[in-house]
Amino acid sequence: MSRPRILFVHGSVVNGDLTWAAQRPLAERFELVIPNRRGFPPGPDVDRVDYEDEADWLEQFVAPGTHLVGHSYGGVISLFAGVRYADQLRSLTVVEPPAFRIAAGDPVVDDYIATSERIWTERSDDPSEFLRSFLHGVGSSTPPGELSPALIQGARTLAVERYPWTAEPPLDELAATPFPKLVVSGAHNPAFDAVCDVLERRLGATRAVLPGAGHSVPRLGAPFNDLLAAFIEQNA
């Protein structure tokens, strides 16, 4: 009997191998598909990253019965992919997708959008400085010392992303799809909480909160893995 198949979609700055390193133990129970998106090591730089185009790019990795899991920018991508590949997906999990427009009007969210726009429009030409500003803003840890070449490339790719807070994922269409949804947040930032609350309500999704790793919820390892495994096995 074939194992349930999970397609993991990473977010900004680091590639799939690093984002989902703590999920490798799940390979004992599931088939794991962990692509590195364009613009991330070991691939070359890119001129532009667009979440809708990335959803199209995922087609090559989607197969019947796929459980789709997206973190951060990968979560935004996955909200679009969930509609595009609805006939092939078994479930959808998103972890803190920065789709802030869906929660616009909430003062905390509006302030976060304004702060994010400043980080991009006033960004330093030095990728290291830009990356540190970004990581501080989203609630991720900032690496000490000189950044590795991989992180420098991640910062360059980050700078050419289509702003995720402009995304308008087709939530009504996504809500109408037959597969279950899981929305996870890290209990560190009320703006991300607000987005996840909207997704829970609009999609009829299961909601989970896993504190302890800030925005980088998958780095928790076992708590996230246990949650994801139980959700997928329930819907296999």
Protein language model regions, located:
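Conserved HGGG/HGGXW glycine-rich cap/lid loop of the alpha/beta-hydrolase fold
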Residues: 1-44
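Active-site loop/oxyanion-hole signature of alpha/beta-hydrolase fold enzymes
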Residues: 31-67
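Short beta-strand immediately N-terminal to the catalytic nucleophile in serine-hydrolase-like folds
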Residues: 68-70, 95
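Gly/Ala-rich beta-loop-alpha elbow adjacent to hydrolase catalytic centers
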Residues: 70-74, 78
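Flexible "cap/lid" loop of the alpha/beta hydrolase fold
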Residues: 83-121
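Conserved alpha/beta-hydrolase catalytic His-Asp/Glu region
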Residues: 124-159
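Conserved serine/cysteine hydrolase catalytic core
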Residues: 146-213
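Catalytic histidine-centered segment of alpha/beta-hydrolase-like enzymes
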Residues: 210-225
